[in-house]
């Protein structure tokens, strides 16, 4: 029976990096995962020649140059900038919520105008201390944006009305009073250029005992 220094549960980024560094330090690692594949939530599968993210798009982002250089030893990353948009009955809005969103919604141009509009709608809703997700969202971005871009999506995502969801879920919602459409503020960001996330994980785990290699 083989003896290991570490049993690593989970073959996602954290487990793969730990196993890689432990192996470099001369340790024996066994990596296990309940899923039938490695790479955790960054797992991709090829469909018609395209690497599709099974669990939703995952973009690597960091402000740490050393971390960026570290991951680039396993794959070359492109400079993908995540600038999503939402389509509400033919109306296109930028995400995360920023001045482009507010301008499209209300015709406002300056941050002061946008903040005044949000405050007006918060006051009209009579919200002082948000008690649920709906009230928290209105406090952050106003009633119009909540009704068009948050209510339906979030209710579908969680399977219950926003009035039944706790306020803390949306407290970290990015709201920017600039015209920057970049979802992340990180200096370094991207997706592996020509290889899948699975290939990145395989390269990280290549000297370890792990599933599906």
Question: Predicted segment positions?
Answer:
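Central helical "cap/lid" subdomain
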Residues: 39-40, 50-55, 207-213
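Glycine-rich FAD pyrophosphate-binding loop
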Residues: 23-48
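N-terminal Rossmann-like FAD-binding beta1-loop-alpha1 element of flavoenzymes
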Residues: 4-31
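Short amphipathic alpha-helical segments
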Residues: 19-21, 43-44, 72-73
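Active-site/ligand-binding neighborhood in enzyme catalytic cores
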Residues: 91-93, 100-213
């Amino acid at each position: 029976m083989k003896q290991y220094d570490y049993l690593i549960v989970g073959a996602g980024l954290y487990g793969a990096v730990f196993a890689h560094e432990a192996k470099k330090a001369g340790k024996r690692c066994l990596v296990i995962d309940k899923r039938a594949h490695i790479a955790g939530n960054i797992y991709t599968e090829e469909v018609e020649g395209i690497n599709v993210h099974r669990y939703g798009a995952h973009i690597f982002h960091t402000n740490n140059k050393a971390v960026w250089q570290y991951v680039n030893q396993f794959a070359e990353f492109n400079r993908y900038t995540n600038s999503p948009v939402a389509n509400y009955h033919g109306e296109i809005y930028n995400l995360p919520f920023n001045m482009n969103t507010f301008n499209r919604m209300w015709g406002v141009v300056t941050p002061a105008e946008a903040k005044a509009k949000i405050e007006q709608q918060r006051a009209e809703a009579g919200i002082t201390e948000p008690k649920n997700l709906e009230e928290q969202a209105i406090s952050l971005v106003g009633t119009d944006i909540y009704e068009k871009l948050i209510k339906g999506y979030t209710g579908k995502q969680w399977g219950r009305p926003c009035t039944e969801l706790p306020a803390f879920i949306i407290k970290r919602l990015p709201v920017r009073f600039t015209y920057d459409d970049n979802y992340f503020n990180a200096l370094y960001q991207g997706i592996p250029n020509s290889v899948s996330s699975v290939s990145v994980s395989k390269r990280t785990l290549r000297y370890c005992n792990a599933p599906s290699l």
